[in-house]
């Protein structure tokens, strides 16, 4: 079943169930199970699987409400544990590419990959934050590859660009002339974009085959430890926020963290290091 048919199937599952509440729960659960299996079977190039996965989560919530109305009919309700949004996690940034104030009061770590449509959707949100909190915020980029067949090569290319001091230029080129241009994330296109970014191509190729695979794996491992399961995910001075949310939701956390940082008595240049030192080193479900 292709993505459009799956979406239609999902709508029918939500509005087309008749009978008792218990019957609705049973039928909806079967459909959710079916959709989960289909999502897992989808090609990792298919961004629609990400969309459907989020919709399934929303429908799981509806199923929970139906269960309450049906006197808590027993069923399997798989949930993905997520980090506590009020907790502060230790997310290192040493040596990773960043944009914004070097000694910022607020550090936003963005966990993302280049095959994720929601990661691209969050790109202008990050630009808005950099503009509206100029001098007080920085965005640090770390790789979290969900679709290895399509997202690994551009991650290596972005890493190689960072080694030549041109990460942001390459980052935007990959999105604009790679992902948004027919999702051409091939090595050949990355080399082409590297030339456009002004990279030294022999060094780029060497780094893509040398240090960068290790660096990307290190990012993946570090982010998994603090609870990242999908993309995009963000840590705002160590506080978790997931998904391509409206900029207003980011600003709520940024404002809270900015006020907290300024009132801490800790020098600006030392503040994020204090978070890394004192934050939770691991997410425990």
Say what each PLM segment does.
Residues 5, 145-285:
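Cysteine-centric redox/oxidoreductase cores and disulfide-bonded domains
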Residues 1-7:
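Bacterial N-terminal signal peptides that target proteins for export
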């Amino acid at each position: 079943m292709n993505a459009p048919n799956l979406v239609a199937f999902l709508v029918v599952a939500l509005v087309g169930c008749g009978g008792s509440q218990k019957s609705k729960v049973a039928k909806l659960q079967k459909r959710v199970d079916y959709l989960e299996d289909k999502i897992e079977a989808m090609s990792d190039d298919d961004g629609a699987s990400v969309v459907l996965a989020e919709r399934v989560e929303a429908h799981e919530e509806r199923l929970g409400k139906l269960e309450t109305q049906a006197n808590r009919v027993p069923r399997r309700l798989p949930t993905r544990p997520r980090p506590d949004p009020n907790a502060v996690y230790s997310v290192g940034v040493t040596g990773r590419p960043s944009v914004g104030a070097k000694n910022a009061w607020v550090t936003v770590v963005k966990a993302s990959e280049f095959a994720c449509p929601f990661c691209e959707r969050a790109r202008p949100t990050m630009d808005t934050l950099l503009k509206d909190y100029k001098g007080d915020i920085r965005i640090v980029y770390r790789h979290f590859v969900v679709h290895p067949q399509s997202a690994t090569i551009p991650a290596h290319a972005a890493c190689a660009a960072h080694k030549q001091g041109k990460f942001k230029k390459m980052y935007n080129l990959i999105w604009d002339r790679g992902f948004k241009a027919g999702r051409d994330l091939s090595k050949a296109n990355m080399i082409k974009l590297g030339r456009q970014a002004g990279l030294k191509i022999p060094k780029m190729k060497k780094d893509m085959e040398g240090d960068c695979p290790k660096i990307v794996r290190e990012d993946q491992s570090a982010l998994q430890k603090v609870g990242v399961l999908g993309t995009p995910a963000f840590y705002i001075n160590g506080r978790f926020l997931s998904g391509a949310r409206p900029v207003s939701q980011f600003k709520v956390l940024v404002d809270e963290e900015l006020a907290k940082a300024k009132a801490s008595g800790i020098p600006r240049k030392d503040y994020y290091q204090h978070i890394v030192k004192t934050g939770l080193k691991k997410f425990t479900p």
